[in-house]
């Protein structure tokens, strides 16, 4: 579906998304509303769970509880601290993906269309709603400007709760491999994932959605850096080349774009810092999840484990700040926001399932192409709905970025054909 038609469909379903050509306003100047203060408060809330938990894990390990423990708590402690089986690196690897013998080209084409449509609809809708929730007011009338939703952490919780429910149902309804990873190891990926999502939502208060999309694309560079630091990976020359092209394209876009309405150098700098935080945290999440897959878990099990701790962290932090009740009250005051937040969470959770299914059926290369096109459509859709302007030089920069991404897909395919070990794509879990 052409992005212009998709814009018409979205506006027909949610007329308020483009209402009035409203421009984003600068965030409040109160020091308690500064993003850095909120970040520190949130991080302190997460630390109030992480630090005691880490100390407990170290205590049980030093006491050799696996050999000496007993009683009702032993199975729980064993699952959380020690796990239930050795890492999969010592076992025979899983068989590669195979297609059913009766699969026909027409059936494969229909499945590919289903996957592509599901991914595009889920994440294009998610992107539109994300920008609507974080940059526009609710309850605006002719005499009242309405009020903004400002608590990004509450929105993260909404997304994670629904994703946890979907992952839990999938684990119950579909056969899963025996889980062996120590549960506490999910907490590190959960923490970085929550922080990356918070930075992502918070950044929309300061920079445009197209800028955010290009920043996500450019995270290839820190992912490579984290890969060297965390996983000790080596990279091919073409990967450094495409990473450089992505950097050039993003720079062309950022330097050629004019300032957003009511923006200032200070707010733009805040947005760029938040995007840098998103990229760094998300890069760590991807590499940590890759290491966790050594325990031979399924993607749905990974999704459940990460979201379980994400819900624990965000609920605890919101309760400590007294913000959970305020977020619930905001939903009660504005039913439109409640609908947007619910649909945003549904799109995020369903998108995860489409990711797993697409990679399982067609592989990572096809999935990467679909998601690359989705990012391009997301920029176009945001410009159509919310009036973001892109200059000719900026458009060329966008083209350079996506050409570099497609070049990466092509190079990986050639390496695979030659029998070389291609660098694995970024972990698909928790893409949003």
From Swiss-Prot:
Gene Ontology CC entries for this record: endoplasmic reticulum membrane; Golgi apparatus; Golgi membrane
Chief localization: Golgi
Catalytic activity, reaction form: 3'-phosphoadenylyl sulfate(in) + adenosine 3',5'-bisphosphate(out) = 3'-phosphoadenylyl sulfate(out) + adenosine 3',5'-bisphosphate(in)
Q: Which SUPFAM superfamilies match?
A: Multidrug resistance efflux transporter EmrE
**Listed GO molecular functions?**
3'-phosphoadenosine 5'-phosphosulfate transmembrane transporter activity; antiporter activity
Give the subcellular location. Answer: Golgi apparatus membrane
Please give the start and end residues of each transmembrane region.
5-25, 40-60, 109-129, 154-174, 238-258, 265-285, 299-319, 353-373, 387-407
Asked if the record carries the keyword Phosphoprotein, the reply is yes
Q: How does it sit in the membrane?
A: Multi-pass membrane protein
Entry-annotated residues carrying Phosphoserine: 427
To which protein family does this belong? Belongs to the nucleotide-sugar transporter family. SLC35B subfamily.
Say what the protein does.
Probably functions as a 3'-phosphoadenylyl sulfate:adenosine 3',5'-bisphosphate antiporter at the Golgi membranes. Mediates the transport from the cytosol into the lumen of the Golgi of 3'-phosphoadenylyl sulfate/adenosine 3'-phospho 5'-phosphosulfate (PAPS), a universal sulfuryl donor for sulfation events that take place in that compartment.
> What is the protein's given name?
Adenosine 3'-phospho 5'-phosphosulfate transporter 1
Per the UniProt record, the source organism is: Pongo abelii
Traced from the root, the source organism's taxonomic lineage reads: Eukaryota, Metazoa, Chordata, Craniata, Vertebrata
């Amino acid at each position: 579906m052409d992005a212009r038609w998709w814009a018409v469909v979205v506006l027909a379903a949610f007329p308020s998304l483009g209402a009035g050509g409203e421009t984003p306003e600068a965030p409040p100047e109160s020091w308690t509303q500064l993003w850095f203060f909120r970040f520190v408060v949130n991080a302190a809330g997460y630390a109030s769970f992480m630090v005691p938990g880490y100390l407990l894990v170290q205590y049980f390990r030093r006491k050799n509880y696996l050999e000496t423990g007993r009683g009702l708590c032993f199975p729980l402690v064993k699952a959380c601290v020690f796990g239930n089986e050795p890492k999969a690196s010592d076992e025979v690897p899983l068989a590669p993906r195979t297609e059913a013998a009766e699969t026909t080209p027409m059936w494969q084409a229909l499945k590919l269309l289903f996957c592509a449509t599901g991914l595009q609809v889920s994440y294009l809708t998610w992107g539109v709603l994300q920008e609507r929730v974080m940059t526009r007011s609710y309850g605006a009338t002719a005499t009242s400007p309405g009020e903004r939703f400002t608590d990004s952490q509450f929105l993260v919780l909404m997304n994670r709760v629904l994703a946890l429910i979907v992952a839990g149902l999938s684990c119950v309804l579909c056969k899963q491999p025996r889980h062996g990873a120590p549960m506490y190891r999910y907490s590190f990926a959960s923490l970085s994932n929550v922080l990356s999502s918070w930075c992502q939502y918070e950044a929309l208060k300061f920079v445009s959605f197209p800028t955010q999309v290009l920043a996500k694309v450019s995270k290839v560079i820190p992912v490579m850096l984290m890969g060297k630091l965390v996983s000790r990976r080596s990279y091919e020359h073409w990967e450094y080349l495409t990473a450089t092209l992505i950097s050039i394209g993003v720079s062309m876009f950022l330097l050629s774009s004019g300032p957003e309405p009511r923006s200032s150098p200070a707010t733009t700098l805040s947005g760029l810092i938040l995007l840098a935080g998103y990229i760094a945290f998300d890069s760590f999440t991807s590499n940590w999840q890759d290491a966790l897959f050594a325990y031979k878990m399924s993607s749905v099990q990974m999704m459940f484990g990460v979201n379980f701790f994400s819900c624990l962290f965000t609920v605890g932090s919101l309760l400590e700040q007294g913000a959970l009740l305020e977020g619930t009250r905001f939903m009660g005051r504005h039913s439109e926001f409640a609908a947007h937040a619910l649909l945003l969470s549904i799109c995020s959770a369903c998108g995860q399932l489409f990711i797993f299914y697409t990679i399982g059926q067609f592989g990572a290369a096809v999935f990467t192409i679909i998601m690359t096109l989705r990012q391009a459509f997301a920029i176009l859709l945001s410009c159509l709905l919310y009036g973001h302007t892109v200059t000719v030089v900026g458009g060329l920069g966008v083209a350079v970025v996506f050409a570099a991404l497609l070049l990466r897909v092509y190079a990986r395919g050639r390496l695979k054909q030659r029998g070389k070990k291609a660098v694995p794509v970024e972990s698909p879990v928790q893409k949003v």
